[in-house]
Amino acid sequence: MALNMGCVSVTLSDEQQTLFRLIEDTDEHVFITGRAGTGKSTLLQYFAWNTEKQIAICAPTGVAALNVEGQTIHSLFRLPIGLIAESQIEQSDATRRVLNAIQTLVIDEISMVNADLMDAIDRSLRQARGKRGIPFGGVQVVMFGDPYQLAPVPPRGDELRYVQDHYRSFWFFDAKVWTGGLQGQGGSSGGSGDQLLDLGEYGTRLHVHELVHIHRQSDDGFKAMLNAVRYGRVTADIAETLNTQGARTPPEPEPGEVPIITLATRNDIVNSINSRHLAALAGREQIARAEVSGDFGRGEANYPADSELKLKVGAQVMFLRNDIAMQGSRRAG
């Protein structure tokens, strides 16, 4: 099945189409995971454009929420930052009206959501909808994310002590709302599968499905190396190949040559490299100042880009979001 979103045509694979029908035609809770490039974001976008259900899309951070044209979890549910535990959840009439209108709640980057916040979402929906005995107040919950890529912020202090006393771990799947154990119906960490997670006394269940077809890479050897890194099974040969190709200082570009992109582990290293190359360009520096609206949670640290963007003629620009223009489309990255 294909969909034309502006100038960009999206066609679902068979496994994506099967999952779309599951979340569209049923009220089952679904967790969709998969390696980078398997189409999680594509499926989420397709569902948002095609569903006949009343949905709300949210994510744990401002950047993640912006990417899916949603809200942060804390903004949607009006939850306080930090440990929520058993504290009273205050809800205005406006918040209750919003939460009562939702048929399906979509959460992106679910792996960054901790167990305490997952339970707070459950309690908020039960409370707002007046259905305290039904998980999520009867709302279908569809979650996208990959625990192998992003983890919750590790708890500290009182929050750590609370998590240790009340949960098996701080991961979302150890929240009280998801109790019981995985009961496999086929599938494994390396293949596709539809698994079920029992929900304790309420008898509901979570479908866990892993997308397995990688659309972003076509080189089988490279994909095998990426999988080895992902699962912690790097052999000496793989390590040597990766170190030979990647763990080296790139040469300085020749005059007029475009610099090689450098991947770094910290923002300060990246910013230093970019500032050095920008300063080397001739011409006057121009500053574009952001117009900020909406809730980004914790201020500038959660902005998708700097509030002041410094540019010169000849500077390279990387798109953080796809731009669908009249003349065609420009892709993020």
Where would I find each of the regions flagged by the language model?
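Conserved ATP-binding/catalytic motifs of P-loop helicase motor domains
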Residues: M1-G333
